[in-house]
Amino acid sequence: MLLGKFIKTLNYTAPNASIVHVEIDARDGKNAYVNIDSPFTALPAALQGADWVQADNRDALYSAVDLMELAVANHATVWIAHDHRLPPPNWLTKQFKPANLTMNVAGQTMNLYRHDAKANASLTLGANTENTRLTEGNMYLVFVAAADKTP
């Protein structure tokens, strides 16, 4: 059983986990985050129709090595939209490649990273930043789309 079209399971360990969930069919006008008015605008083509984790933006500075764990369907592409103001954490740069695409969420530019998952992949995603001195930033967003969706 899938939570969405491409996300099979999700485990979210931050303080606001009870309201975080998987949404389907990403498109302009839908809210990026569960807790603030944050409609997608000019969503890149590769993300349109994707599943995404509708995270709580208040969890942006929460620190955990296993903040999110998800299993995805066969041959999916996992995308991370990460706030350009924050240095990318090690888990992001080790598992994902910069996609040279951006999007805007809640007034901030988000850099996109991609990971081409193979058969029934599971991923563990950590904290949004490793710098505990930061005081602001958008929570990263996770999108999962069919592998044939390219930028």
Label for each model-derived stretch:
Residues 59-60, 64-77, 113-121, 145-147:
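Extracellular and analogous surface-interaction loops
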Residues 41, 48, 60, 104, ...:
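Amphipathic alpha-helical interaction segments
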Residues 4-61:
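Glycan-recognition and processing domains
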